[in-house]
Amino acid sequence: MKVNNPFIITSKYVSKEYFCDREKESAELVGNIRNWRNTVLVSQRRMGKSGLIGHVFSTPEISKEYETFFIDIYDTTSLDDFVLLLGKEICERLQSRGEKLVEKFLMTVSSVVASFSADPISGMPSIDLKPSATSSAGKSLEQIFKFLESSSRPCVVAIDEFQQIADYRDGKKIIATLRKLVQNCQNTCFIFAGSNRRMMGQLFNTPSEPFFMSCTPLYLDAIALDKYTDFVSGHFKNNGKKIEKKCIETVYTLFDGHTWYMQYVFNRIFEATDAGQTANLQSIETAISNIFDIFEHVFQEMLLRVSEKQKALLIAVAKENKVKNITGAQFISSYNLKTASAIQGALRPLIENETITKEVDCYRITNRFFSLWIAKRY
């Protein structure tokens, strides 16, 4: 598939041509699947989890031997949402292989009702699932697992933002039920992906939790600078354009190798660079200035939603980029933040709503563009 801009910023996997590196992680994930090791995949949001999963699912050793299913449950709030999302994904994936497989699914999962229609834009057939009047989400989940286990080909199910289940009503009970179903599977392998390191760690590394030590961990860090440099310069060259190496290094450093933010900037730089031209450091300034203009009202509204104490803390964190000792005397005095207890009070809700992320050794504003915008404006 040929695209106009090689720097993809959607989470949907396109092809290996537009996928950078991750050779080691891909090999590990393929090995886990082929050797029936369930995987817990953890990284920051927008670091490339779904892209990695899509890439692995497209490899010949997986695509030719396995049925693969992927759902992102970030927007789900209940087991009903989860079940219908998984059921819809299975139906849509099976559609391309014939009506009989879809019919088999609907016969096995009798607790859901399907309606069929044509997509008004693409004209492709679309499936909508709803729970039957007498069904329960728990029963539907059991029936879906039964269907997966009866498949003629082994199945792989990837669930992104898995930690969301912990926030469901009766989340602990649902997680325990899932663990019981998963451990009894002989024909289905699972990838549990998540971006909240603390919650994923609690679910999979705490002895009292059902999923404790049940999966092989895989952590997704930044792509190496040399690999990403080759990726960026290669796409510019293939399209009759050039880019200075220093330009790539600067963007990489600015975002600490965080994939999506780099991709977004280079998407803009690529668009602004005509064939025969060379992108340089000025290209970065122009691209980021344009990004600030686009998100100006969004960022202003985000600041309006926080208290004055929270705003002061956000400004301080943005100025530092990342803060190791957020309640330390030096940080407090540098930005006139009053007391450590006041910081803790302001920090707690910002972490809960994911405005600030607590990493292994520091705190930082989750949205890197928001952080840069604050640092420049204040």
Give a label for each model feature:
Residues 1-44, 357:
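A short, basic N-terminal segment
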Residues 2-6, 246, 293, 297-378:
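C-terminal leucine-rich, beta-strand-based interaction scaffolds used for sensing/assembly
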Residues 42-47, 51-156:
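P-loop NTPase nucleotide-binding core
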Residues 59, 268, 349:
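Alpha-helical DNA-recognition elements
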Residues 75, 216-227:
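Conserved AAA+ ATPase "SRH/arginine-finger" region at the nucleotide-binding site
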Residues 128-196, 205:
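Conserved Walker B catalytic segment
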Residues 197-215:
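Short regulatory helix/loop adjacent to the ATP-binding pocket of P-loop NTPases
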Residues 233-297, 308, 360:
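Amphipathic alpha-helical "lid/sensor" segments that cap RecA-like P-loop NTPase cores
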